[in-house]
Amino acid sequence: MRSCGYHLPSATQILLTFLDTPHHLNTPPSQHPTPSQHLTISTPYHSDMDIIKRNFFRILQNTVFGMSEEIEPMSKYKWNVLAKLAETHGLGEYFADRADIPVVGGLQNLPDAGFSRMQNLLLNSRLKKIRKTEPFSEDSSIETLNFLDIIVQTTQTILTNGLHFANIVRIGDYLRKDGDKIDFIKLEKWLSRLQLAKIAQLEASILIQTLGFELDEIPFITSVTPQAYDMAIEALDAPIVIKQDEWQFHNSGIFVSNNSKAMRKTFRNYKKYFFYAPVEVASCCVHRFENSISTIEE
């Protein structure tokens, strides 16, 4: 095996460096709202939200969730900005008739939820066991199982590629169409077993804070995550797009190199969500690093 001029740290070193780096979201907030504070939440458009974001959320509420929110008039330029924003989040089909861009993929292009998996081996084995045994249980609920898979898939997308609204909208769409068939007691138990309760609460909180859902529509959470609104707006202002091949290490002569910008972007994303799913974030971190260096020619 050729020696190289670049020393690759072990996966353990990478993980320890990652875990030792402080981040404002790695510690739980000092105060959480009580459920009673959120039972009457309506569409919460903050005073600092610009017209493009307001129309983004209102069009989704009207086209996906059957609401009747008023759409504000905008210039052709702003409609094009909105359409490109929707395209970035995989929701272009709902905005194409309002701007000069072709219809692009939306919810129907998301992979089937049954293909979801977790990077942590123990948690993934638990997910497989749930998926295998649930259809044969006495109180079997396939709708609950499907919804769990949607949450797992959404979580994996957020951790790997950043927050994209196509997945958040899919959660809301399933709740509105099949929410009455979901066994929420069973779902809560599964989320706890998979250590996904906090990040599932974050995903549901984004529905409440931006898309007009009420707390009582989402029985598997008891309060709204305070940071949900800011994280949702950040995803619109500065969407993260991380492609798998951006993270690959390349062996060029005697040197090994990689896309450091993509690596920093990925680790910032991991740190942002570490508090909400620490075990899965750590496993994703190690998995991505090991998968990237495995492509180096020995």
Ranges and model annotations:
Residues L15, H46-E298:
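Conserved NTP-donor binding/palm subdomain of two-metal-ion nucleotidyltransferases/polymerases, i.e.
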Residues I14-L15, P22-L25, P29-L39, P44-H46:
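Compositionally biased, intrinsically disordered low-complexity segments enriched in Pro/Arg/Gln/His
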